[in-house]
Amino acid sequence: MVAAQAKLVYHLNKYYNEKCQARKAAISKSIREVCKVVSDVLKEVEVQEPRFISSLNEMDNRYEGLEVISPTEFEVVLYLNQMGVFNFVDDGSLPGCAVLKLSDGRKRSMSLWVEFITASGYLSARKIRSRFQTLVAQAVDKCSYRDVVKMVADTSEVKLRIRERYVVQITPAFKCTGIWPRSAAHWPLPHIPWPGPNRVAEVKAEGFNLLSKECHTLAGKQSSAESDAWVLQFAEAENRLQLGGCRKKCLSLLKTLRDRHLELPGQPLNNYHMKTLVSYECEKHPRESDWDESCLGDRLNGILLQLISCLQCRRCPHYFLPNLDLFQGKPHSALENAAKQTWRLAREILTNPKSLEKL
């Protein structure tokens, strides 16, 4: 048994050093190419409208606010200033979303975003995004990369297609630090010793973002109040949870396997599903020794089996907001197909670790 485990870990490490590192290098190169263009577009936006200031800065070889959706798809979060005159309200009526309401006694004129406040005093995510989309469309025509970049049509999101190869979504957002949403108040679960009080304090201090984007849980039934709502996102908090042991390596393996074998019709699975399942696996195996290098095979296998279970149940709860289903709106046939493919992949890796050389 120990010999079989060691063999699997050996082949996973080999796969990581060859395939995962190659994937990372290729994505880093793509990110540099994409960020040059996006920075130029955002510089042009700022000239037209100084309230939209580019926050796409490189720090320690990574760009703040940039998320990799897939090797050719990225999201750039554009942090806006001056949320201060609004109260953050998440009463759970819109899973995964919250609203920003003008604080009592505050005049509209005190806000930097006065013309985007609705009659009921809410700061409208949709109105801000609509204005931003117009500005980006104008900037694309003026910027120095205009020959290689164009807007993606037929969406209320701000999406750019670059060199016919990459798609980048630029999402206006507010950063919320020092507060924690009520809809995530149950976390951490009291009977689970992971992630420990110090890490919990770090994660909660990191806070979350409020994004102006279409909320998929409301697709097809968006009333005006709902389209004014902001989507909760915990990217930095989630990144903190992946620190230590072989967690990041495990996630890197899962992303690479997804890119190579689970990029399927209907796009049932993305990198975020993998990241979410790593967090759940950490709860199931709370001891640091469970994430030792020697346990890499067990952890990967556990996550793949959990993924199959989620696909078969057609439900993958968000880690911090369990009422939010990350498979919402995905075609059932696509989820079934993904379950079969994941099962084949898991069986192949477990019964014949050497097959990783071809995967």
Swiss-Prot record:
Its EC number is 2.7.7.-. InterPro entries: Mab-21-like_nuc_Trfase, Mab-21_HhH/H2TH-like, MAB21L/cGLR. Pfam families: Mab-21 (PF03281), Mab-21_C (PF20266). Mg(2+) binds at residues 73, 75. It is found in: Nucleus. The keyword Repeat does not apply. GO terms for cellular component: nucleus. GO terms for molecular function: metal ion binding; nucleotide binding; nucleotidyltransferase activity. Putative nucleotidyltransferase required for several aspects of embryonic development including normal development of the eye. It is unclear whether it displays nucleotidyltransferase activity in vivo. Binds single-stranded RNA (ssRNA). Monomer. Homodecamer; composed of 2 back to back homopentamers. The protein may exist as monomer in solution and oiligomerizes upon ligand binding. This is Putative nucleotidyltransferase MAB21L1. It comes from Xenopus laevis.
